[in-house]
């Protein structure tokens, strides 16, 4: 699953005590979408701007680096090596992280820069800003041909993405709970309605709301009695309180010995078919989940390549046989 906004908030809450004040010693770019900041104290901060797995976390996984660092990596080294982390912020419940850094240039001048991670699926990006909020460079440049409304190019002032027209449990709690009490139309599926009206909530959590209210993940509003509607409102209230109090639990879901999802709270919707396991930290949870996923994808890719090679050899053999002269 993509890292949803509440889970991202949980990760950042965990990271702050370890990262605030830490010094950046090295910058690496093991893959096109990955930047690793090596921090004083043997910490490795991974910032992934890949379409399928955008995230920020501390990682214990050692990744091979290319012999020649990419240009973006060299630029980050120039600006960030020696910098100290001043703050780590998330705008409301957006899938974004803003690292504010105190940097010293080659002339000894001190300034603040920001490294912005946008965890937005195929639009994920990593952007370096100067002290005035101008873009120094992006992992992916976005010009007018790619977006008519929001360009990301060196020299332009950086602007946050336009927020979705949805309610936030963090900054609009009262309105959020009032809307939950009204609910949707009788034929509307509860989980779909939750996704349409609230920001920061993933499909997994929307289904969990529906399940805990109506005992089914695809329950519709018309099937809920008054008690169940009250239970749905309570889910919103409990989640809002957990977010405000930063009360989270790293949870990873396994099915057939394979990780299928992760989140920040207990999950009941799958029953016995899925094992719900907790971990000591969100970074450990993310390392475990994505490392297993990458191994599965590598194994599947190798299997496809082996099948393709066998198919190619078989076709070649058939071609050779067809070209053999027939006996008189």
Map each language-model feature to its residues.
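Extended, highly charged segments
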Residues: 1-317, 323, 327-328
